[in-house]
């Protein structure tokens, strides 16, 4: 997952833009608006350090969350991953505070 995040950060700016949005409009090939894709990432917009992320939830894996954070240093990022959680957003908030020293 960290390798995937690195690829997105450094080589896929269009994907980073999409995973940073709370919602993204979806258009048909002919340009007609179809609907808004809604993110399930409750932490988007909660901190200026959160650039984007990916959520996941299955019976087998439980709640999963990957977040990409920007630090105060140029070109320095933190990738936090929570796997198999019953409270992925709460656990991620705690991890983010520790990682950022806040």
How should these model regions be labeled?
Residues 2-102:
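Penicillin-recognizing serine hydrolase domain
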């Amino acid at each position: 997952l960290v390798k995937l995040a690195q690829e997105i950060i450094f080589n896929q700016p269009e994907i980073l833009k999409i995973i940073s949005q709370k919602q993204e409009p979806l258009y048909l090939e002919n340009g007609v608006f179809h609907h808004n894709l809604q993110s399930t990432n409750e932490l988007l917009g909660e901190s200026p350090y959160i650039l984007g992320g990916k959520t996941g939830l299955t019976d087998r894996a439980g709640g999963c969350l990957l977040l990409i954070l920007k630090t105060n240093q140029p070109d320095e990022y933190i990738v936090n991953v929570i796997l198999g959680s019953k409270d992925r957003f709460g656990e991620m908030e705690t991890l983010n505070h520790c990682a950022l020293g806040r």
